[in-house]
């Protein structure tokens, strides 16, 4: 399979997993002040549907092309480590750039959930990275 198509599919799979984890977080009442879809919607005219599409485009296309581009020419290896690294970089960008764009302090430390925001989002992005790398490995090895 073309490595870029594999990357986009892997990104889509990883975004589904992250979205489910975010949904479970909300259902359990954890960090109610941190709703990334609502935050994106607030910058895109208020539509949560459009924000969810944007979230999936970033996860699928952005991260998918990212892992495919970073994977190089040797596609006969395991890309989980690369996926974790990409997840970490995505988390760091979110914490130092996206949060301020959303009107929050870096790392979201001004939010009521405080230190839970960077810790929980780091864990989510690392899980995302594992799924991204594992799915990409499976797809490019077909």
Where are these regions (language model features)?
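Juxtamembrane/disordered regions of integral membrane proteins
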Residues: 1-142
